[in-house]
Every structure is written in C-alpha cells, then in structure tokens.
C-alpha cells in the first residue's frame, strides 16, 4: 500500500527526514516513556514498529523510503558526543540513512559538532522539549553559526506539543534565527500546536522548513488539530514542507501519515514536493550539502497533472476533518 501511494504520484520513492535510530538501550527507554503513559497525551501510545534495528531498516526500504534521517538527541550533558559516535557507525552500515548528529549546551559542544560535520553529518536534531534547554544559550551560539555556515540542516523540536517545555514555542528559537538568519532549520511536527507562528517564521526566513511528522493523523488531530484557515498558507509554503513520520515511534501504521497528507487535497504536485522532491533538493545534488548519492529520479519530476501547490481544494471543516482512510491510533500492527 505504501509503494502504491508513491508510485501513483510518479515518484521514485519517498524521502522521510524524521525517523529515529538510536543505540538500543536509549531507544528502549524512549519506547518505555511512550508506552508507559508519560508522554502527556492522556491516551495510549503503543509503538507500532517495536522491532530490531535490522528489521526497521528493512521495513523502510520495503516501503520505498529511499533516504531517511536517523535522528537522535540527548536529554543531559555528556551524552551527545557518544550519540554522535554511534550515529556515525549507523550511517556507515546504512548507506540510505542520512548521517545524523546532535548536540547539547555544554562545554565542548562546538568541538564535537565540528567533528561530526567533518565526519560527514548531513542532518542534526535538537529537542528543546526533552533537553529542556534554551536554544539561545551562549554555549550553542557557535554551534548554530557553524551549522548555518555549513548549510547543514537541523531538525528542531521547538513546538509545545505534546506538552509545553520551558523553552518551547516560537519565542526562544526565533532568537536563534534572528542571530543566525541563514540557518537551515526544519521545524518538527509543523510546530504543533503553534502552527501559524511557525509558518510565520518560514515566511520571514527563507531557509526555515517544516516537517509533517504526525501532522494531520487522527492521533495528533485529537491533540492539536491543524486549523483549516491555515491550509492555504500550508499550500503556499509547499516548497518548504518535508515528509517526516516519527517512525518507528508511532501508534499507527506508516501509511496513515501518507493518507493524512493526501486527504488535505492540496494536489499531486504538492504531495510530490513534500514526499520526495523538496528533500532531494535540500540533501541531494542541488542542495549544496554534499550527499551526492543517487536519489532515483530528478527533483523536477512533477509531470503528473493536477492542482499546483496553490490549488487548495480543502473545503469547510477543520483540518481535523481528516479524510485519510484506516490507520486509527489503535491499528498499530499493520505496516
């Protein structure tokens, strides 16, 4: 079913920039956090793809995910450098994974970030909610500057979903962008629940992107529905939206995320851009990032007819009028 989705769009596959691969002991704690009811969502969060690493990689490949992030993040000092070392090994044995890395506000952060970039890291993750830190911390100023200069994207969980942190919301990260306007930042989860404010940031800063992780799924729509009034803006920002899924830490089948996006009725060109072309441009031959491996098709493959990015056909109701079929939050055993 997943392969039928992207083949129907005339794509060579998917690029999912927001998946998680971590050392087994760390991932086990993440899974226990979600399944133990500590995520603050007031409902069950079963892990749909609780499988060994090799099986998770094989599943993404079977889905037709040609490139994927391998995001990981620390929750305390003296952890990021070790995570980066593990991530480098994962990237070496998983050529279709985007070599990912992370950081924490601590002495030496600039040094190990420079080392990771030099070793080939092409995507970073910052989790302001879990890390509980201020992104404007002076120990991170050189880190943000380095990422901006190298044009290496960083996925930032800066929205206040599923629960607010001391430094979530648009305010703190806006301070970083004001100081480093050339930073290539990807706002995780479309910035839920502050969708409009983070779309504003994308309008002000040309290198700010947003990923779709969990957005428009039945699960997130119950917690933080996307306002229908913002759909035209989402359509207009189509060249800045990237597919993300949160695989494997999702409580529904992978296909549900794709069907939720299709259910917005923003047109086939918008879906092609979001599900493949935007990330191929950002990380592939045209992105200046240096990861020149074949992506299985050019970025400009938008030949199928249908509405343009601005052809917003969503009518009435909230964006929570989710027309995606299947994939209820409890259907976690279906790929």
Predicted ranges, named:
Residues 18-24, 157, 189:
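Histidine-centered divalent metal-coordination motifs
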Residues 122-123, 133-242:
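Catalytic pocket-lining loop regions of alpha/beta-barrel enzymes
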Residues 84, 108-110, 173, 194-198, ...:
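Short, well-ordered alpha-helical microsegments
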Residues 66-67, 74-168, 206-209, 217, ...:
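Active-site gating/metal-coordination segments in enzymes
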Residues 1-17, 24-67, 237-240, 251-306, ...:
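Mid-to-C-terminal alpha-helical segments outside catalytic/metal-binding sites
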Residues 18, 87, 147, 189, ...:
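Conserved, mostly hydrophobic/aromatic
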Residues 25-30, 81-82, 112-113, 167-168, ...:
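Short aromatic-enriched loop/helix-cap "lid" or pocket-rim segments at secondary-structure transitions
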